[in-house]
A protein has these predicted regions:
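C-terminal active-site-proximal or functional interface alpha/beta core segments in diverse enzymes
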Residues: 221-308
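Glycine-rich tight-turn/loop motif centered on a GG-T
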Residues: 33-37, 107-108, 127-131, 170-191, ...
Length: 308
């Protein structure tokens, strides 16, 4: 009689051999060779739905979209699965933009981040109608020029530099020494200062070719505790509130809470571990009704590569 031991949702052992879903790993290696990376479509879909459900429960004030980072997995079949599940796509390079477009993602849910973005890349982003996150003050004139030349409206978000005053636990993102997270967040993550965001925001609001849809902040994977995310959300919410006040009561439609999780690879964490801090930190008056974008949910929401 066969002895079966379930490891998790997609892995099990049968008579001492590893099975992935209903596939014998030994048979797979015999067919395709080794090393072999195997991805479970069912597990990818389960992961995406766990995140989507958990974040939606934590944010009842408007729609929530999960935007996995394209750089985590460029395989077109995986990207098509994510698009089919209603995800967006967080991208940086022209190549990643091509992957996202070919996979069939909703263009309004394709988010272009990072510096530097060259003129050709920005022009293509405007032409395709994807969201552009402005990471530096030099990008806005290029976006304005591309929008004017194409007769289109470019939709943008402004990236605020993270600030975590007083969070002195050492950053897990920095390998060289015990660097406090509040310092690491400023040193290792890009973005615009408060004054720069306000100045760019005023310029955009006076410009008919560019539409400001919201704000972005990349939080990184500095610390595994949920307290880190509580403090990040509180700080981000307060900063967005200050910016909106300085812009005369501007109401953002989208808030992009991009970031990675400093987590162990196994076993799977509960998605609620990371969605619950949103309820504590991101509820403020200007945020009601906006769209929450959870960007860069990489490992758990995209794939579980298995090699044996």
């Amino acid at each position: 009689m066969a002895t079966t031991r379930k490891i998790d949702d997609c892995l099990s052992t049968r008579d001492g051999q590893l099975w992935i879903e209903e596939c014998d790993s030994v048979a797979l290696v015999e067919r395709f060779g080794s090393p072999l990376f195997v991805l479970s479509e069912n597990q990818i879909r389960r992961n995406v739905r766990r995140y989507q459900q958990s974040f939606q429960q934590g944010w009842p004030h408007g729609p929530v979209k999960v935007l996995p980072a394209a750089k985590a997995n460029w395989i077109s079949a995986v990207q098509r699965i994510l698009a089919d599940e209603g995800c967006g796509c967080d991208i940086y390079s022209p190549g990643e933009l091509s992957v996202a477009l070919s996979a069939g993602f909703d263009r309004e849910l394709i988010s272009v981040n990072g510096v530097p973005k060259d003129e050709d890349h920005i022009a293509r982003c405007v032409r395709e109608g994807v969201r552009i996150t402005i990471d530096s003050i030099e990008e806005l004139p290029v976006i304005e020029r591309a929008a004017s030349e194409q007769g289109r409206t470019a939709r943008v978000r402004l990236r605020l530099k993270p600030a975590l005053p007083g969070f002195t636990r050492h950053s897990h993102f920095v390998a060289e020494g015990l660097v406090p997270t509040d310092i690491a967040a400023l040193a290792y993550k890009g973005g615009l200062s408060f004054d720069q965001v306000v100045a760019l925001g005023r310029r955009i609001l006076d410009n008919g070719k560019v539409e400001l849809v919201g704000f972005h902040q990349h939080h990184g994977r500095h610390h595994p505790s949920t307290r880190y995310w509580v403090e990040q959300m509180k700080s981000f919410a307060a900063e967005v509130g200050r910016v909106c006040t300085a812009l005369g009561g501007f109401q953002p439609r989208e808030i992009d809470i991009g970031g990675g999780f400093a987590i162990r690879r196994d076993p799977f964490n509960a998605a609620t571990d990371y969605s619950e801090p949103l309820q504590l930190g991101a509820l403020f008056a200007t945020a009601r009704g906006l769209e929450l974008l959870g960007a860069r949910r990489r490992y758990r929401s995209i794939s579980r590569p298995v090699s044996y």
